[in-house]
UniProtKB/Swiss-Prot annotation:
Transit peptide keyword on record: yes
Coiled coil stretches, renumbered: none
Record-level GO cellular component terms: chloroplast
Enzyme Commission (EC) number: 1.14.19.2
Gene3D superfamilies the UniProt entry points to: Ribonucleotide Reductase, subunit A
Binding-site positions, Fe cation 1: E135, E173, H176, E259
Function of the protein: Converts stearoyl-ACP to oleoyl-ACP by introduction of a cis double bond between carbons 9 and 10 of the acyl chain.
InterPro entries, per the entry: Fatty_acid_desaturase-2, Ferritin-like_SF, RNR-like
Primary gene name: S-ACP-DES1
Subcellular location: Plastid, Chloroplast
GO molecular function terms attached to this record: metal ion binding; stearoyl-[ACP] desaturase activity
Designated name of the protein: Stearoyl-[acyl-carrier-protein] 9-desaturase 1, chloroplastic
Domain of life from the UniProt record: Eukaryota
Source organism (scientific name): Arabidopsis thaliana (Mouse-ear cress)
């Protein structure tokens, strides 16, 4: 779950129609997404139409001959990628952190939880709910990974290490939304029906990360997102402890640790791609950054607020949970992690991609500095249905 670069330049919007454009490095190829938020019926009631993507997206951009690379990496993935998974019997489960329903002290435990949650501020609740909703849209993310050529689960139960990883990764991630959902439900501080509607809308809307069925692009995207999610959950853990809820702090910290482990796995894949096919990989990395990393929940909607994602991400930016600075820092980290500056023997396109990537973090930071002033001037109180319509500065 992350969102901050959208506040700088990623999206432009109106009250009823979002137009998400992307500038591809493929020359004339482009991808545009039109999201229809709502329409009006004859009686003046809003009829929601799930966000739709006009099919002008680039698809199947990886040359067919590259498929053999991922086939040849199956042995490597079996030995290196699957090692990042934890056995189910040794994994934490949501009930480890929640009141025990079979215990005679269950009601007292719930009461203690609710007392702790009274100290959580409304703006913190908005960020925590947004994190949870994003985690709950997990079906979308598994679907996205299974669009990638050469690594998708072809049968639903394929024994290839790529497919085994995707299913097991999904199973580990599934606990995150479950745990945060139950905790927020028990807290009594949020409108669960509005939250549940938002989750349903979001899963129904899908996402367009502009990965083009291309595993080079897909694994660069997941590397970025997992690190961003690690940062976000780590900051919600810190804030929960500051607000006096040590249990919630432990929950968010535990989720953050999972995200970091997953980040290591995905960055390891891209590291291997840089080793065996540096030119294609660096060009793909630059392509994803030119298009900007679209956030998993960018089609978020609750049936009321057409700009819900922007408002949510603004609160997260203000609290320091996930910011435009974090976006630049993640990019810098990946450039260094994959030794982009030290690549040699590249094509002319690869050299241009290398130069672009090495200079981009500084450019983003300058944009972020300019945007900060405009954001402060434009801030206003926004009602959030997740907290019964109470207003939060966004």
């Amino acid at each position: 779950m992350v969102m901050a670069m959208d506040r700088i330049a990623l999206f432009s919007s109106s009250s009823s129609v979002y137009h998400h454009g992307s500038s591809h490095s493929h020359g004339s190829k482009s991808s545009r997404v039109f999201t229809i938020r709502s329409d009006s019926t004859a009686v003046g009631r809003k009829l929601y139409i799930p966000p739709r993507e006009v099919h002008l997206q680039v698809k199947y951009s990886m040359p067919p001959q590259k498929l053999e690379i991922f086939k040849s990496l199956e042995g490597w993935a079996n030995d290196n990628l699957l090692a990042y998974l934890k056995p189910v019997e040794k994994s934490w489960q949501p009930t480890d952190f929640l009141p025990e329903p079979e215990s005679e002290g269950f009601y007292d435990q719930v009461k203690e939880l609710r007392e702790r949650c009274k100290e959580l501020s409304d703006d913190y609740l908005i960020v925590l709910v947004g994190d949870m909703i994003t985690e709950e849209a997990l079906p979308t993310y598994q679907t996205m990974i299974n669009t990638l050529d050469g690594v998708r689960d072809e049968t639903g139960a394929s024994p290839t290490p790529w497919a085994v990883w995707t299913r097991a990764w999904t199973a580990e991630e599934n606990r995150h939304g479950d745990l945060l959902n139950k905790y927020l439900y028990l807290s009594g501080r949020v409108d669960m029906r509005q939250i549940e509607k938002t989750i349903q809308y979001l899963i129904g809307s899908g996402m367009d990360p502009k990965t083009e069925n291309n595993p080079y692009l897909g694994f660069i995207y997941t590397s970025f997102q997992e690190r961003a999610t690690f940062i976000s959950h780590g900051n919600t853990a810190r804030l929960a402890k500051d607000l006096g809820d040590l249990t919630l702090g432990k929950i968010c910290g535990t989720i953050a640790a999972d995200e970091r482990r997953h980040e290591h796995a995905y960055t390891k894949i891209v590291e291997k791609l840089f080793e065996i096919d540096p030119d294609t990989t660096v060009v793909g990395f630059a392509d994803m950054m030119r298009k900007k990393i679209s956030m998993p929940a960018h089609l978020m909607y609750d049936g009321r607020d057409d700009n819900l994602f922007d408002h949510f991400s603004s609160v997260a930016q203000r609290l320091g949970v996930y910011t435009a600075k974090d976006y630049a820092d993640i990019l810098q980290h990946l450039v260094e992690r994959w030794n982009v500056e030290k690549l040699s023997d590249l094509s002319s396109e690869g050299n241009r991609a290398q130069d672009y990537l090495c200079g981009l973090p500084a450019r983003i930071r300058k944009l972020e500095e300019r945007a900060q002033g405009r954001t402060k001037e434009a801030a206003k109180n926004i009602p959030f249905s997740w907290i019964f319509g109470r207003e939060v500065r966004a």
